[in-house]
Amino acid sequence: MSDFAFFALETLIKCIIIIAIFASLAGLATYAERKVLAYFQRRIGPDMVGPFGLIQLVADMIKLFTKEDIIPSNSQKFIFAIAPLISAICAFVSLAAIPMLPEFTLFGRVIQPIVADINVALLFVIGTSGLCFYAVFLGGLASNNKWSILGAARGLVSIISYESVGALALIAIIMLVGSFSLVDINNYQSDGFFSWLIFKQPLAFVLFIIALFIETNRTPLCLTENDAEIVAGYGTEYSGLRWGMFFIGEYTSMIAGAILVTLLFLGGFNSFWIIPGWIMMIVKSSFIFFWYFWARAAFPQLRPDQVMKMCYLILIPLAVLNLLITALTVLL
């Protein structure tokens, strides 16, 4: 087999595996979230369908896929129909430049668990994952429903504001490493536990985590939907498989965000003592993913004015200060 044919086949297989695994993980994440929230609230959670309630996921999928797909008569039908698809596609595309695990050898060839190892991988991931929100905005706007439009508008304001916070935090990382490549950032932290960037950039870590909660529409910083204020927000008019596409896109973005935090701040897939790198990657990413559930159970939803004041009066000044300190450190 020629090198080009092997490369094309390898890339196709990687894409299929990523879509299959992350779509499945997005479904399993709902079961995990319900169990974790039940534990925090001293409940049992799903436990009736199958062992430990695991088959509940299959039952929910059957219910979701058999629901009627309703398109409101007064909506912008084409945009309303494609918005969920845009959300899922952008979430999966963002995974293309993320190195998942250490490289390994297969059939005498070195395989890198990444679809596209590009020099501007960090910029690519942030850009494509940010596009997921435009699907949310388009879906809310096209619904022609006051709750949907209000949720989309609130979300648009928050994402524009907090992307500045996340970007400033990432610029500090780029200044230290000197590269946009996620592989280079991972390798920068290969000298042991104290080479992890969380110790060199603790403030950037906190800022990026907060921005990530906004990016993935998670409590307590989610403004796009709130049962007590705007019902389901942008998703009020969605049902069936189209709502499921939004759901898959959101949870895929959450998983991608957890992996990205691990690569940027927690040593990535580098080995730790006698623990292989791939195990460390899974453990650290799972721990960060658990934070989504922990925060939802522990903190109340913030009001929109509180979220925006925190951004402009606290987080952006801190991000700029961190950037200045990092610049001085690099120069000196």
UniProtKB/Swiss-Prot annotation:
InterPro entries xref list: NADH_UbQ_OxRdtase_su1/FPO (IPR001694), NADH_UbQ_OxRdtase_su1_CS (IPR018086)
Transmembrane regions: 4-24, 44-64, 78-98, 120-140, 165-185, 194-214, 255-275, 279-299, 312-332
Subunit structure: NDH-1 is composed of 14 different subunits. Subunits NuoA, H, J, K, L, M, N constitute the membrane sector of the complex.
Superkingdom of origin organism: Bacteria
Annotated Gene Ontology cellular component terms: plasma membrane
E.C. number: 7.1.1.-
Name assigned to this protein: NADH-quinone oxidoreductase subunit H
Chief place of localization: membrane
NCBIfam families the record matches: PRK06076.1-2
Source organism per UniProt: Campylobacter jejuni subsp. jejuni serotype O:2 (strain ATCC 700819 / NCTC 11168)
Subcellular compartments: Cell inner membrane
Gene Ontology molecular function: NADH dehydrogenase activity; oxidoreductase activity, acting on NAD(P)H, quinone or similar compound as acceptor; quinone binding
GO biological process, any: aerobic respiration
Catalytic reaction annotation: a quinone + NADH + 5 H(+)(in) = a quinol + NAD(+) + 4 H(+)(out)
Top class in the EC scheme: translocase
Protein topology in the membrane: Multi-pass membrane protein
Keywords: Cell inner membrane, Cell membrane, Membrane, NAD, Quinone, Translocase, Transmembrane, Transmembrane helix, Ubiquinone
Job description of the protein: NDH-1 shuttles electrons from NADH, via FMN and iron-sulfur (Fe-S) centers, to quinones in the respiratory chain. The immediate electron acceptor for the enzyme in this species is believed to be ubiquinone. Couples the redox reaction to proton translocation (for every two electrons transferred, four hydrogen ions are translocated across the cytoplasmic membrane), and thus conserves the redox energy in a proton gradient. This subunit may bind ubiquinone.
Similarity remark: Belongs to the complex I subunit 1 family.
